[in-house]
Amino acid sequence: MFACDELLLNASTIDATGLQLSNQAIVIRKGRIEWCGSEDQLPAHFQESAKSRKDCHGQLITPGLIDCHTHLVYAGHRAAEFRLKLQGVSYADIAKSGGGILSTVQMTRDASEEELVDQSLPRLLALKNEGVTTVEIKSGYGLDLQNELKMLRVARQLGEVAGIRVKTTFLGAHAVGPEFKGNSQAYVDFLCNEMLPAAKNMDLVDAVDVFCESIAFSIRQAEQIFQAAKDLNLPIKCHAEQLSNMGASSLAARYGALSCDHLEFLDENGALNMVKANTVAVLLPGAFYFLKEKQKPPVDLLRQVGVGMAIATDSNPGSSPTTSLLLMMSMACQFFSMSIPEVLSAVTYQASRALGMEKDIGSIEAGKIADLVLWSIKDSAALCYYFAYPLPHQTMVAGEWVS
């Protein structure tokens, strides 16, 4: 009979739906969960063979948290724009004066890879400090071949330096590259024919995203990009129905999207198509708050038809300058009227589904990677009750406790 590496006893945990369980035991072996369940059903040989035991004293253990939608690789900031917005200056006027997303594009292009790592690493470490063990990072502030690849390389490097799992998403279709101003179709053609294949060939991309909106890319252009991704066997995601209902969610679902994100203007048809495709709804309360949006995502509709809901930070310099997934959890309860179990599932199991990783992470189940967080609380509601607190007591990544 083999020995287990770690035995966690007398823990409270949550299941994949976010419901709390008491008196639980977790057996860790070779970086994975070997066994988990009620402590009174723990096989005796695990008790006898464990190399290390930890009595959790009823404290909560969750899966490692997952931030499944971020843009945290970028240079500079847009605090000066925030000051202007508070003075009543419109986004259109800010953009005309050289601000907006293209200002971040310019600063990101001007930064070296080393500078991008130096500026972005603190944001990733802030997430890690809150018990996040997997982070999705999008490109989208390069908008040309050289700089999109640079961003993706930096994202990969950040995961290695920070010691947590990073999944990369190619978001060249975030805005039209400035060199293609006035000719968005030429940019989309270049993206599909040159940029995306290069990222794939260099093994820098895990998924492909498109911002489908009247101010960004059309339904036809989004479909062209989705087809290019499909031809390269890359899964897709979509910034969909954030500012209007364009039918992007239905299109993305037709291509088997892992997730559709934002979704403030999602309708029933789009939601039903997402259910059929097992597409997750990623809700982003940070952007809702920072942009002072009035239209909430239709949580009741998503709940009614059975669309899984994830929560993420949307960490970015323009519309959600945050690195606190814990704060987003509280906001999801308060702004979107999500229940505590829904929110706990949203940053664990549902977030893993949004990355196509539910077979390996996102829940405490035998066979899954041992990404776990031990909290200094006993009631899971406290994770949503507090604002960005408490911080983890200990975090485990692939079976190893990390600092």
Curated annotation (Swiss-Prot):
One term under GO cellular component: cytoplasm
Catalytic activity as recorded in UniProt: 4-imidazolone-5-propanoate + H2O = N-formimidoyl-L-glutamate
Classification via SUPFAM superfamilies: Composite domain of metallo-dependent hydrolases, Metallo-dependent hydrolases
EC class (word): hydrolase
Subcellular location field: Cytoplasm
Main location: cytoplasm
Binding site for 4-imidazolone-5-propanoate: 78, 141, 174, 242, 319
Positions of Zn(2+) binding: 69, 71, 239, 314
Single GO BP term: L-histidine catabolic process to glutamate and formamide
Entry cofactors: Zn(2+); Fe(3+)
UniProt entry keywords in alphabetical sequence: Cytoplasm, Histidine metabolism, Hydrolase, Iron, Metal-binding, Zinc
GO molecular function, one term: iron ion binding
Keyword set includes Cytoplasm: yes
EC number per UniProt: 3.5.2.7
Residue numbers binding Fe(3+): 69, 71, 239, 314
Residues that, per the record, bind N-formimidoyl-L-glutamate: 141, 316, 318
InterPro entries hit by this protein: Amidohydro-rel, HutI, Metal-dep_hydrolase_composite, Metal_Hydrolase
Textual note on the cofactor: Binds 1 zinc or iron ion per subunit.
Protein's pathway: Amino-acid degradation; L-histidine degradation into L-glutamate; N-formimidoyl-L-glutamate from L-histidine: step 3/3
Similarity-based family: Belongs to the metallo-dependent hydrolases superfamily. HutI family.
Biological role stated in the UniProt entry: Catalyzes the hydrolytic cleavage of the carbon-nitrogen bond in imidazolone-5-propanoate to yield N-formimidoyl-L-glutamate. It is the third step in the universal histidine degradation pathway.
Protein name per Swiss-Prot or TrEMBL: Imidazolonepropionase
Organism: Legionella pneumophila (strain Paris)
Gene from which this protein is expressed: hutI
